[in-house]
Amino acid sequence: MSNIFRGLGVALITPFKSDMSIDFEALERLVNYQLDNGADFLCILATTGETPCLTRSEKDEITRVVKSVVKGRVPLLKYCGGNNTRAVIEEMKSSDWEGIDGILSICPYYNKPSQEGLYQHFKAIAEASPLPLVLYNVPGRTGVNMKAATTCRIAKDFPNIVGIKEASGSLEQVDEIIKNKPEGFEVISGDDALTC
């Protein structure tokens, strides 16, 4: 499977007005700014986008607005994740994925699953996903680190898992993934300190 999530990917924030409603005009400006300044793909509704604080209707409207501005000019990666495997699958099944090129899905948080638990979570999601998946390992937010061996096992077993946004902060872990990943599996930096 060809991977389109390469180069400069920008995780969009969700701009709010002072009354805490979403500022859709600011969102449109933000998307155009990123496109005008060379973003190769955009990621919507991830942790930077304040997804846990948004309602389903707000998420749907953000998706609609971003798609209407992008108009296919760059690939869109949309977040769909959580610590409840069945709920993630249900959200995948009930969401409109038209105009979206891939799904970003975080390691389950709070419950601190084992490495086998992480594997089983992503196995179920991969089997249900309508689009290519990018895993998201951010232990500083989830409380659990998906080890390199687990990442590579998942990547090898499920060809629709095309990459990982790796934010463990461990250069050693990133190096191990790069050395052992299947061909075409992308490692996207989710850690600014390791990117520089």
Residue ranges: model-predicted function:
Residues 2-145, 153:
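Active-site beta->alpha loop and helix N-cap motifs at the rims of alpha/beta catalytic domains
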Residues 127-128, 141-196:
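Catalytic alpha/beta core domains of metabolic enzymes, predominantly
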